[in-house]
Amino acid sequence: MLAIVAYIGFLALFTGIAAGLLFGLRSAKIL
């Protein structure tokens, strides 16, 4: 149970970081 929660949390964190990087690169291109 705990491993599943940790795995989901890790995926959410990784997705958030990837989205942040993509958004940052897109903003840099616009600027």
UniProtKB/Swiss-Prot annotation:
GO-annotated cellular components: cytochrome b6f complex; plasma membrane-derived thylakoid membrane
UniProt protein name: Cytochrome b6-f complex subunit 6
Family: Belongs to the PetL family.
Subunit description: The 4 large subunits of the cytochrome b6-f complex are cytochrome b6, subunit IV (17 kDa polypeptide, PetD), cytochrome f and the Rieske protein, while the 4 small subunits are PetG, PetL, PetM and PetN. The complex functions as a dimer.
Chain segments annotated as transmembrane: 3-23
Species this chain originates from: Nostoc sp. (strain PCC 7120 / SAG 25.82 / UTEX 2576)
Function according to Swiss-Prot or TrEMBL: Component of the cytochrome b6-f complex, which mediates electron transfer between photosystem II (PSII) and photosystem I (PSI), cyclic electron flow around PSI, and state transitions. PetL is important for photoautotrophic growth as well as for electron transfer efficiency and stability of the cytochrome b6-f complex.
Membrane topology summary: Single-pass membrane protein
GO molecular function: electron transporter, transferring electrons within cytochrome b6/f complex of photosystem II activity
GO biological process: photosynthesis
Locations listed in the record: Cellular thylakoid membrane
Species lineage: Bacteria, Bacillati, Cyanobacteriota, Cyanophyceae, Nostocales
SUPFAM superfamilies listed in its UniProt record: PetL subunit of the cytochrome b6f complex (SSF103436)
Pfam families given in the database record: PetL
Primary location class: membrane
Keywords: Electron transport, Membrane, Photosynthesis, Thylakoid, Transmembrane, Transmembrane helix, Transport
